[in-house]
Amino acid sequence: MSDSKEPRLQQLDLLEEEQLGGVGFRQTRGYKSLAGCLGHGPLVLQLLSFTLLAGLLVQVSKVPSSLSQGQSKQDAIYQNLTQLKVAVSELSEKSKQQEIYQELTRLKAAVGELPEKSKQQEIYEELTRLKAAVGELPEKSKLQEIYQELTRLKAAVGELPEKSKMQEIYQELSRLKAAVGDLPEKSKQQEIYQELSRLKAAVGDLPEKSKQQEIYQKLTQLKAAVDGLPDRSKQQEIYQELIQLKAAVERLCHPCPWEWTFFQGNCYFMSNSQRNWHDSITACQEVGAQLVVIKSAEEQNFLQLQSSRSNRFTWMGLSDLNHEGTWQWVDGSPLLPSFKQYWNKGEPNNIGEEDCAEFSGNGWNDDKCNLAKFWICKKSAASCSGDEERLLSPAPTTPNPPPA
């Protein structure tokens, strides 16, 4: 840096000398003109001396200022060069960074496309073949559903009371299940599946699984048809037998709606939700029934058993709302004296305005009518023949006596 400053200083010195020489030349000419005008006298000499001294002082005073300006210009040029160098350096680094970024981007794209195309193609072809193979498989789901429906039908028929018939029906249904599972024609399988579904629904609606003999005979005929198939090809015979079996089931008597229980010519509904006593009356009326009114000891034992099995507090249609201490059924009939034995020990006690009767444990209890409890509805059953009615009616069971 010092080497570059010395030539600059020399140039500045020469420039100052030229400026001084030019000024002296111009001043000399002025002096001569003045002397020519005024003549050669002492006054002229003094004036000339004074003028020369003043000019010299002015020029000397200018020299440091010029040197200072030159130094400032050099510093400014140096600073500009330094900034330019830094800018060029940063520009170079940024261009390198940009180039590296672009290369990395291209490399990333290239690497992303590198997975083994041959392996991918092989996997794709294998998946395609597997998809086609699975698509050609027979409808296993339908066969499985047929199997499940037959299993449920077997369980439903297996609940019939006559154990000897039940075992034979169970075995025949097991063989039928295996035979139908092997049938090849899908269209016939679909028809069989639909018929079995309808048959399942029909059998499921039977209140007490009646007409065992007729079902047993139809299953025997169906077994003979299945056993006589040489190559499992006579599916039409199986189909016809199923149609006949379905018709036989549909002819069976349905004295009570689904989810109602048949007993001695009446149907009973045990609720799964809870209401107060008045709302329970309304709920029974909405289904064409009434809150249960007990007419016999057998009916009482049957209902008490149903309630105690579920361990529920259940409303009956009995209260003393009209007259305290006078218990009356919702149909207006009074409570018979012989029925008072069904009250639990110490009941009814009318503690806190307890005016409605409920099944509680192994007997009856009075409680507040506004409490929510389960309830039992009762209505007459549909007409069936005497034989069927005997099959539908379970034998009454006497509940355990209340604890002492």
Swiss-Prot record:
> In the UniProt record, which is one GO cellular component term?
external side of plasma membrane
What's an example Gene Ontology biological process for this entry?
A: cell adhesion
Indicate where this protein resides in the cell: Membrane
| Listed SUPFAM superfamilies | C-type lectin-like
**Segments forming domain C-type lectin:** 263-378
Q: What is its main location?
A: membrane
Stretch list, region 7 X approximate tandem repeats:
96-257
Q: How does it assemble?
A: Homotetramer. Interacts with C1QBP; the interaction is indicative for a C1q:C1QBP:CD209 signaling complex. Interacts with ICAM2 and ICAM3 by binding to mannose-like carbohydrates. Interacts (via C-type lectin domain) with CEACAM1 (via Lewis X moieties); this interaction is regulated by the glycosylation pattern of CEACAM1 on cell types and regulates contact between dendritic cells and neutrophils.
Miscellaneous notes for this chain? In vitro, is a receptor for HIV-1, HIV-2 and SIV and transmits viruses to permissive T-cells.
Function noted in UniProt:
Pathogen-recognition receptor expressed on the surface of immature dendritic cells (DCs) and involved in initiation of primary immune response. Thought to mediate the endocytosis of pathogens which are subsequently degraded in lysosomal compartments. The receptor returns to the cell membrane surface and the pathogen-derived antigens are presented to resting T-cells via MHC class II proteins to initiate the adaptive immune response. Probably recognizes in a calcium-dependent manner high mannose N-linked oligosaccharides in a variety of pathogen antigens. On DCs it is a high affinity receptor for ICAM2 and ICAM3 by binding to mannose-like carbohydrates. May act as a DC rolling receptor that mediates transendothelial migration of DC presursors from blood to tissues by binding endothelial ICAM2. Seems to regulate DC-induced T-cell proliferation by binding to ICAM3 on T-cells in the immunological synapse formed between DC and T-cells.
Protein's name according to its UniProt entry: CD209 antigen
- The record lists the organism as Macaca mulatta
Chain's gene name: CD209
